[in-house]
Design a protein with these regions (language model features):
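Non-heme Fe(II)-dependent double-stranded beta-helix
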Residues: 1-11, 16-109, 114-117, 232
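Double-stranded beta-helix
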Residues: 135-202
Length: 276
């Protein structure tokens, strides 16, 4: 594998330098642009109307041909398998994040796993920028926070607790005021670099005050021990109807979550009642 900055087991986040070829990056960029030009009903604006534009969309791989091609032909799944030490890797979902120039809105500190309908320890989120990302606006992590605990997930714009009742989880600590207790790591990135992090690792990102776009494709991967964990609330992203098809504790063996490593031919003639 390419040069690695960081330690996965220790930090819960690493940077893989030069992981993707220029052709891979160009394909990912086309996928992002196609997605932004044709947003799904799951898309949202995560910034105020007067503040640039921070656009997110989810679960587009099955309708954006360039995205599916990137996932299946680039080395991203092999990298995920190598980092996790997994024998089988499934795609959980894709997530497009675009911060246009002049966007002040930060992505606040959060963990991904509390928003999801999965449990287990072998998982990986991959952050794939197709534009240069200066250190000042890159994704940052609290090293070692993948070991827990869970912190209260809140909405990004108005800090509402929509997923867990108030008081049921610990609130986020003051990370900036306690750098020795919560060491922050992050990397300046060039197209071709990818950042891998555990779904329980605390992370944040600044706005994009500069003149260039910050386009990112983030892919979420599931390893060997990940199982379905139906929630009493609407997850982000949602998977309507899935709890009727996969019981709690079942492996994520479902057409919505295809095996991407080792490579397998797509199933034919498979139907599902789960909403696409």
């Amino acid at each position: 594998m390419s040069d690695i900055d960081g330690d996965w087991e220790r930090d819960g986040a690493i940077c893989v330098r030069g992981a993707l070829s220029p052709n891979d990056v160009a394909l990912a960029a086309r996928a992002i642009d196609a997605n932004v030009a044709d947003l799904s009903p799951l898309a949202k604006r995560a910034s105020e109307s007067a503040d640039g534009a921070f656009i997110e969309d989810f679960r587009s791989w099955s309708r954006i041909a360039d995205m599916e091609q990137f996932i299946t032909t680039s080395p991203v799944a092999a990298i995920a398998a190598n980092v996790m030490g997994a024998t089988t890797v499934r795609l959980f979902h894709d997530h497009v994040l675009v911060k246009e120039p002049g966007t002040a809105q930060r992505t606040p500190w959060h963990q991904d796993i509390p928003y999801y309908n999965v449990d287990g320890t072998m998982n990986l989120s991959m952050w794939i920028p197709v534009d240069p990302v200066p250190r000042a606006i890159t994704l940052e992590f609290v090293a070692g926070s993948h070991r827990g605990p869970w912190y209260m997930p809140r909405t990004f714009l108005d800090a509402q607790a929509r997923w867990f009742p108030e008081g049921s989880l610990a609130e986020l600590p003051d990370i900036a005021a306690n750098p020795d207790q919560f060491p922050v790591i992050g990397w300046e990135l060039e197209p071709g670099d990818v950042v891998c992090f555990h779904m329980q690792t605390l992370h944040t990102a600044a706005g994009n005050p500069g003149p260039g776009r910050r386009r990112v494709l983030s892919l979420r991967f599931l390893g060997d021990d990940m199982v379905h964990a139906p929630r009493a609330w609407t997850t982000s992203p949602p998977f309507p109807g899935l709890k009727e098809e996969l019981p709690a504790g079942a492996s994520m063996d479902h057409p919505l979550f295809p095996v991407v490593w080792p490579p397998v031919p797509p199933p034919s003639g498979t139907t599902s009642s789960v909403s696409e």
